[in-house]
UniProtKB/Swiss-Prot annotation:
It catalyses: hydrogen sulfide + glycine + NAD(+) = ADP-5-ethyl-4-methylthiazole-2-carboxylate + nicotinamide + 3 H2O + H(+). Its cofactor is Fe(2+). This is Thiamine thiazole synthase. The keyword Protein transport does not apply. Glycine binds at R234. It comes from Methanosarcina mazei (strain ATCC BAA-159 / DSM 3647 / Goe1 / Go1 / JCM 11833 / OCM 88). Belongs to the THI4 family. Fe cation binds at D156, H171. Pathway: Cofactor biosynthesis; thiamine diphosphate biosynthesis. It is an enzyme of class 2 (transferase).
Length: 260
């Protein structure tokens, strides 16, 4: 058949616009497209929640793509292998309790798992602010195009209403820090956002799961953002804690949605 460039343009514009409008009112907005939020998105979508991931960059996956220092391999502990199994990610045992997976395959299958389950992805869309209502509860997010943010252009944003937000923005804990900056006397965590501690893989991995919580009304924190929000150590290219944090975040969100 003969291709018509205008039909191609219309197809892309109309279909994306329909999806964008459909997702202006959702159950859970996952800010950041790293491994923790990809895991959470899959489990939430499978449970029937209407969820969307908002990622400022072109690609999802956070820091998982490059493995350790651009060696495309990651390490996962035995207790997190069930999450790898859920996504069909292959791995092998290196030493007892240490399992190695290909980082590129891992990211690809995490993305495929989340989207196949029904999670919608808005890449090149940046988080700019939160929406609040009574008692300063988080009720939505304010978004803009990623290049608008990176180029510091003066362009007003648009808004998304959501029952819950999951901050999966990694080391910067962007959503948490926005709340601290904009809501006087807001209490997040025991000491506020002090940033993560230096490397300690064992403790950082354990606390990544322990720190995954509804840290502020309407806001759940997951992955490396959970460590940054609770003054826990970083852990490097071992990703079991990230995967289990995403699993826990989904469970917390589903329980919370039942009460809203």
């Amino acid at each position: 058949m003969e291709l018509d460039e205008v039909i191609i343009t219309r197809a892309i514009f109309e279909e994306y616009s329909k999806t964008f409008l459909e997702y202006t009112d959702i159950d859970v907005a996952l800010v950041g497209g790293g491994p923790a939020n990809l895991v959470a998105a899959k489990y939430l979508a499978e449970a029937g929640a209407k969820v969307a991931i908002y990622e400022q960059k072109l690609s999802l996956g956070g820091g998982m793509w490059a493995g350790g220092m651009m060696f495309p391999r990651i390490v996962v502990q035995e207790e997190a292998c069930r999450v790898l199994d859920d996504f069909g990610i292959r791995y092998k045992e290196y030493e007892p309790g240490y399992f190695v997976a290909n980082s590129v395959e891992s990211v690809g299958k995490l993305i495929a798992g989340a989207t196949s389950a029904g999670a919608e992805v808005f890449n090149l869309v940046s988080f700019e602010d939160i929406m609040i209502r009574e008692n300063d509860r988080v009720t939505g997010i304010v978004i803009n195009w990623g290049p608008v943010t990176t180029q510091r252009l003066h362009v007003d944003p648009l808004m998304i209403r959501t029952k819950l937000v999951i901050d999966g923005t990694g080391h910067d804990a962007v959503v948490c820090n926005t709340i601290l900056r904009k809501i006087p006397n807001a209490k997040i965590g025991e000491f506020g956002i002090l940033g993560e501690k230096p490397m300690w893989s064992e403790v950082g991995e354990r606390l990544a799961v322990d720190a995954t919580q509804e840290i502020y009304p309407g806001l759940i924190v997951a992955g490396m953002a959970a460590n940054a929000a609770t003054r826990a150590p970083r852990m490097g290219p071992v990703f079991g804690g990230m995967l289990l944090s995403g699993e826990k975040a989904a469970k917390l969100a589903l329980d919370r949605l039942k009460k809203i």
